A protein has these predicted regions:
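Amphipathic alpha-helical segment used for protein-protein interaction
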Residues: 1-20, 30, 34-37
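Helix-turn-helix DNA-binding motif, specifically the short coil turn and the N-cap/start of the second
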Residues: 31, 40-45
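Residues within the DNA-recognition helix of helix-turn-helix
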Residues: 49-52
């Protein structure tokens, strides 16, 4: 549907690291500890990337209101 299409568009617009973290956390429902091992990145950095990704996606989706 339209909301799903906009979500996918918003995710595609993210920087690569944020997109990867968001996809693994949101869609794959992985834990930060698992993502940390895969990407060889600290959990703190992953949480920051995820938070920024959610913020950018939210702003993008609200731009259609």
């Amino acid at each position: 549907d339209e909301v799903q299409a906009r979500l996918q568009e918003a995710v595609a617009r993210l920087p690569e690291v944020q997109r990867t973290v968001f996809n693994l956390k949101y869609f794959e429902e992985m834990k930060y500890s698992e993502i940390s091992q895969i990407l060889n990145t600290s959990e703190g950095a992953l949480k920051a990337s995820y938070h920024l990704a959610v913020k950018k996606i939210t702003e993008y989706l609200h731009s259609f209101d």
